């Protein structure tokens, strides 16, 4: 059911009031009579109802309409108004809905075509913008892949170079470790040799001290002889010294009787042993003499 405009509702209320005025007794005024006599429009009780064509035309039985001069319309306007009312009644809409729908759909189709054209016009730059953005995205993706591939290759080359350097360093480390082992062995041998040399030096020092003592003793004996202490020695010691220094006659005679060849035949070992024994005897005698001099 179509919604009615306010003017139609007011018109129906006016017609309903007029129909009710015909049913009332003469001499009784309704609330809208003064308004009709003064030429004003009164909506009546405000009830909403739909009247048929006979009521609108005033031809219905017992429904005689009274139109004031101020509200009365010309015949042409009344005919046009009646035609408009017929078109807007629910009966006319229910009887012939096809022309109305076709009339309503015709401008809608035109408006739809216009909207489609406008949408296509709006979509065309959007589509172009979308294509451009898609192209940019694809190019960016390709460039990113290329850069990633180049970076992977660079990293692979760096990794291989580092691996070769590691292998080289490992070889150098092994060679240096071997050299360190050899050096440690040499150091150990040097330490051992140093200890041996130190012991040899100590032994030589002891020997040097012994030699110095012997030299001092010899010098002391020589000094005693030079100072004239020899006469102070006892006769016994002196005799012993003379007996030690003097040669026996038999030996002297023997030396006289010996020839040169026999003397040459004596071995140097025997001569060295005799000299050593002689030296020992001299040193012992000198020591005993010095002890007698300095008790």
From Swiss-Prot:
Pfam families: bZIP_1. It is found in: Nucleus. One of its GO terms (cellular component) is nucleus. Transmembrane segments: none annotated. Residues 162-176 are annotated as: Leucine-zipper. The keyword Flavoprotein does not apply. Residues 16-26, 120-136 have a biased composition (Basic and acidic residues). Residues 16-157 are annotated as: Disordered. Induction: Induced by cold stress in roots. Disulfide bonds: none annotated. PROSITE patterns: BZIP, BZIP_BASIC. Its main location: nucleus. Homodimer. Probable transcription factor that binds to the DNA specific sequence 5'-TGAGTCA-3' found in seed storage protein gene promoters. May function as a negative regulator in cold and drought stress responses. This is bZIP transcription factor RISBZ5. It comes from Oryza sativa subsp. japonica (Rice). The lineage of its organism: Eukaryota, Viridiplantae, Streptophyta, Embryophyta, Tracheophyta. The gene is RISBZ5.
């Amino acid at each position: 059911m179509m919604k009615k405009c306010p003017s139609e509702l007011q018109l129906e209320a006016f017609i309903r009031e007029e129909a009710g005025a015909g049913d009332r007794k003469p001499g009784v005024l309704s609330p809208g009579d003064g308004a009709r006599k003064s030429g004003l429009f009164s909506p009546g009780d405000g009830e909403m109802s739909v009247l048929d064509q006979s009521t609108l035309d005033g031809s219905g039985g017992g429904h005689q309409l009274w139109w004031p001069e101020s509200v009365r319309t010309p015949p042409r306007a009344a005919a046009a108004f009646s035609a408009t009312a017929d078109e807007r009644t629910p009966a006319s809409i229910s009887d012939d809905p096809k022309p109305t729908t076709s009339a309503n759909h015709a401008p809608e189709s035109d408006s739809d075509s216009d909207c489609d054209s406008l949408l296509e016009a709006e979509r065309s730059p959007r589509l172009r913008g979308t294509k451009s953005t898609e192209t940019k995205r694809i190019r960016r993706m390709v460039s990113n892949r290329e850069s990633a591939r180049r970076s992977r290759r660079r990293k692979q080359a760096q990794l291989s170079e580092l691996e070769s350097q590691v292998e080289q360093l490992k070889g150098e480390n092994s060679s240096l470790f071997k050299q360190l082992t050899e050096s440690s062995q040499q150091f150990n041998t040097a330490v051992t040799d140093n200890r041996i040399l130190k012991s040899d030096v100590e032994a030589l020092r002891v020997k040097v001290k012994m030699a110095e003592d012997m030299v001092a003793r010899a010098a002391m004996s020589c000094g005693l002889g030079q100072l004239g202490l020899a006469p102070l020695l006892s006769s016994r010691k002196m005799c012993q010294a003379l007996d030690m220094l003097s040669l026996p006659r038999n030996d002297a005679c023997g030396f006289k009787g010996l020839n040169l060849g026999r003397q040459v035949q004596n071995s140097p070992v025997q001569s060295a042993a005799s000299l050593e024994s002689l030296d020992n005897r001299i040193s012992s005698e000198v020591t005993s003499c010095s002890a007698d001099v300095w008790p």
